[in-house]
Amino acid sequence: AASRAFARGLFHVQGLASQFAALCVGAQPGQKVADLCAAPGGKSLTLAECMQNQGKLISGEYVESRVPLLRKAFARCGVTCAEAVQNDAAQLRSDWGKFDRILCDVPCSGLGVIAKKPDIRYKDLDGIENLLLSQQKILQNGADLLAENGRLVYSTCTVNRDENEEQVKTFLENNPRFHVAVPALQLPGMQQGEYGTLFLPHKTATDGFFAAILETESTQ
């Protein structure tokens, strides 16, 4: 962060697995894109870069005090196509209209980033049911906001199957018009399964991470 190049917005720092999720969105110039759980903003910056700063990017964040982090990141990198807003992704915002591409990088247990945040290992999962419900709501809201022929990416920084594959499986059962698409980007060690792509730290040398590309049958 002390680098002049960083201060000028010439680059931003992001984990490989996190960048993978943002790239899977496939955002393009001129599209309308949403990052529903955006702070601190790394994935939104990658989305804006893919869009070549053209189109409209809505970056929502539930915690109001974190919204300025998004605005600061956009200002530093010269991003003008994005709008940072305080928003509860678990509540549907029909007034936003439809989006061509949506990223749902949902709140999770964080078990994939224990190496960075060792305190996570001391937390129990007593509240996991509420977390799972919130993830389901965010994913469904993303689907409801998606335009015809759109693409939705569901991602977490955990390796907990209940938060990953099982969430996607349940979503597909409730939304049969969707299917899981195989990512064009292939990285060493990542595991492509029926319900998404899993990154395990000992195999990918990244954070533990999960991402699923969800498209409708008519998506080109």
PLM features: residue spans?
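S-adenosylmethionine
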Residues: 1-220
